[in-house]
Amino acid sequence: MVAHRARRRKRASATQLYRTCKAAGTCPPDVIPKVEGTTLADRILQWGGLGIYLGGLGIGTGSGTGGRTGYVPLSTRPGTVVDVSVPARPPVVIEPVGPSDPSIVNLLEDSSIINSGSTVPTFSGTGGFEVTSSATTTPAVLDITPATDNVVISSSNFTNPAFTEPSLLEVPQNGEVSGHILVSTPTAGTHSYEEIPMETFASPGTGNEPISSTPVPGVSRIAGPRLYAKAVTQVKVTDPAFLSRPTSLVTFDNPAFEPGDETIIFERPYPPSQVPDPDFMDIIRLHRPALTSRRGTVRFSRLGTKLSMHTRSGKGIGARVHYYQDLSPIGPTEDIEMEPLLAPAENAAGDSIYDVFADVEDADIAFTGRSRSATSSRGYTTVSPLSSTLTTKYGNVTIPFVSPVDVHLHPGPDIITPASTQWPFVPLVPADTTHYVYIDGGDFYLWPVTLFVPRRRRRKRLSYFLADGTVAL
């Protein structure tokens, strides 16, 4: 088996070796003369150049370029350069200018006359005039007397089809031929129209249509403050200053501005000696108030943040406290018992009830029963409703009346007696003594007498009277 020889590594060039070994003094003996040009061949050329000029031959240690003219191939002649001369311009003839000749030189030759087209037609008419010129110096005298004959002047228009002024274009006119028929000149082209379908903007719907462009499915609820979480301490505050001046519970300072519905931020936790309420110790923030209802009460709440410790990074850590104060309980709804307006038939005479919706036939009975006093077995006595004194078991109570009010009286029909009366007059038997009272009103109030009557039964019928109305007898 033949062993392969290792490849020979190429040595660096003399220039690269000279750069690194010159300063250290470790260069090989053939590197420095080759780079500095002190070899034997260089010295022979230097010595021979003292007496012989060899600069034009290009002999030296440099790159071979063949000198100034380059290398010339053997058995050939160098190429010759043909010089092509540019013909000379003819000399400009200089014309002599005399003292009396003009100094202006015409740059252009005589130009030819450009044809301007057809001539403008001359004016022709029946009553024209001619202009004559003369060399006389006699002043002209104009006759300003008006002419006796009427002068008619006619004119002719010539249209150039090559050019028409836009301002002189004639617009086609409409001509009325007969009654309601209008004939117009036809125009170029036809005008077409497009049928656009009409859509209804408002139409009756089912009520389930969306009212916004992107309706949100379902109902989104706003999350309230988490006041009753396990990590929140519950503290009840009884001081009423917690509602209006919560900062007075944290510090003794008297601030000029007391924010009510905003978050209160304290710069630093105050020492225990400067905190009026110990429950508000180490408080650095009190959030805005919130009103809630819990277990039948209206509760005023504020969420506070305490600063208990600091970490090495400077961040403060503290607990959250829920301060609350119950304002008032929410009582159950009371049931209001409705009282009937119509009185039963077995009503006692002592119960003074004024029923304005009673029948007309019962008016006389009700009037008779109300005009006398009645004593019941309940231990109190009532008098006529027109009286202002009420006698009870507690003594006499005087009820003052209000100022008199004008009552409008509407008279009834006139009573006309018969013209022929027979004497002696015999009245009809039985005589009709019924009197009717018509009351028209809308507002009713409790009779003041019934306010001082003790109620012992659950269902008590109260009296009513008119606040404003009219009475007709």
UniProtKB/Swiss-Prot annotation:
Disulfide bonds listed in the record: C21-C27
Name any Gene Ontology BP term.
viral penetration into host nucleus
Give a Pfam family name: Late_protein_L2
Q: How is it modified after translation?
A: Highly phosphorylated.
* Subcellular location(s) of the protein: Virion; Host nucleus; Host early endosome; Host Golgi apparatus
Short sequence motif Nuclear localization signal: positions = 1-12, 452-462
> Keywords assigned by UniProt?
Capsid protein, Cytoplasmic inwards viral transport, Disulfide bond, DNA-binding, Host endosome, Host Golgi apparatus, Host nucleus, Host-virus interaction, Late protein, Microtubular inwards viral transport, Phosphoprotein, Viral penetration into host nucleus, Virion, Virus entry into host cell
Where does the UniProt entry say this protein principally localizes?
virion
What HAMAP family does the entry give? PPV_L2
Homology family: Belongs to the papillomaviridae L2 protein family.
* The protein's name: Minor capsid protein L2
| Organism for this UniProt entry | Human papillomavirus 28
